[in-house]
């Protein structure tokens, strides 16, 4: 018998500079007639009444897909760890599903798998694809916030290092060629 999934917040990270997209805001780049962030939001919406998008520009456009918007406290696109810290501060639920805005092929089974793994072990859960951690596909308990803030204050800027150093992390193993984990972070990948 499977247990019910807990209420969770969804944190979609869309605050990057978009360098590999020629400076374009990746989450708003169109794919199959909709912005990439819309594809992610459609998949996750049924899991939560609290979709938070971390974005540092184009807030009015992102507002269409979020219940809350946050921006990094630091200027000049400091990286995903800054967005995670800011997002965890406003998340309304104890569990937070964290995803990249440029991963439109995710599905509900992936989200459910991460959530179940995190809840069963009462710890963070992260995709490990072909032996490599993928921090942009994670579930975090909000209680990791002080540990991530401490890592940031100590100079850590790597999301993966901060997460793996802060708390036990359960691995959701995925195949190296799992298309659900594709990041569309360059124009060529959108074709």
Curated annotation (Swiss-Prot):
Keyword GTP-binding among record annotations: yes
Domain notes: The N-terminal domain determines nucleotide recognition and specific binding, while the C-terminal domain determines the specific binding to the target protein.
General function of this protein: Transfers a GMP moiety from GTP to Mo-molybdopterin (Mo-MPT) cofactor (Moco or molybdenum cofactor) to form Mo-molybdopterin guanine dinucleotide (Mo-MGD) cofactor.
NCBIfam families per the UniProt record, alphabetical: molyb_mobA (TIGR02665)
Keyword Protease carried by entry: no
Species per Swiss-Prot/TrEMBL record: Pseudomonas entomophila (strain L48)
One Pfam family recorded for the sequence: NTP_transf_3
Gene behind this protein: mobA
Signal peptide: none
Alphabetically ordered keywords of this record: Cytoplasm, GTP-binding, Magnesium, Metal-binding, Molybdenum cofactor biosynthesis, Nucleotide-binding, Transferase
Subunit structure and binding partners: Monomer.
Residues that hold Mg(2+) according to the record: 102
List of residues binding GTP: 13-15, 26, 72, 102
Catalytic activity: Mo-molybdopterin + GTP + H(+) = Mo-molybdopterin guanine dinucleotide + diphosphate
Family: Belongs to the MobA family.
Name assigned to this protein: Molybdenum cofactor guanylyltransferase
Enzyme Commission identifier(s): 2.7.7.77
């Amino acid at each position: 018998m499977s247990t019910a999934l807990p209420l969770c917040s969804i944190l979609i990270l869309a605050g990057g500079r978009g360098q590999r997209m020629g400076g374009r805001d990746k989450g708003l780049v169109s794919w199959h007639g909709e912005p990439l962030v819309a594809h992610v939001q459609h998949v996750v919406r049924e899991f939560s009444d609290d979709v938070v998008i971390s974005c540092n520009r184009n807030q009015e456009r992102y507002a269409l897909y979020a219940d809350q918007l946050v921006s990094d406290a630091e200027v000049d696109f400091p990286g995903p760890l800054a967005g995670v810290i800011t997002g965890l501060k406003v998340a309304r639920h104890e569990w937070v599903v964290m995803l990249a805005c440029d991963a439109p092929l995710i599905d509900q089974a992936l989200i459910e798998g991460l959530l179940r793994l995190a809840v069963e072990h009462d710890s963070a859960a992260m995709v490990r694809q072909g032996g490599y951690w993928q921090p942009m596909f994670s579930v975090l308990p909000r209680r990791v916030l002080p540990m991530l803030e401490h890592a940031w204050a100590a100079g850590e800027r790597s999301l993966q290092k901060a997460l793996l150093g802060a708390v036990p992390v359960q691995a959701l193993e995925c195949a190296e060629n799992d298309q659900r984990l594709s990041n569309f972070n360059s124009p060529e990948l959108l074709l």
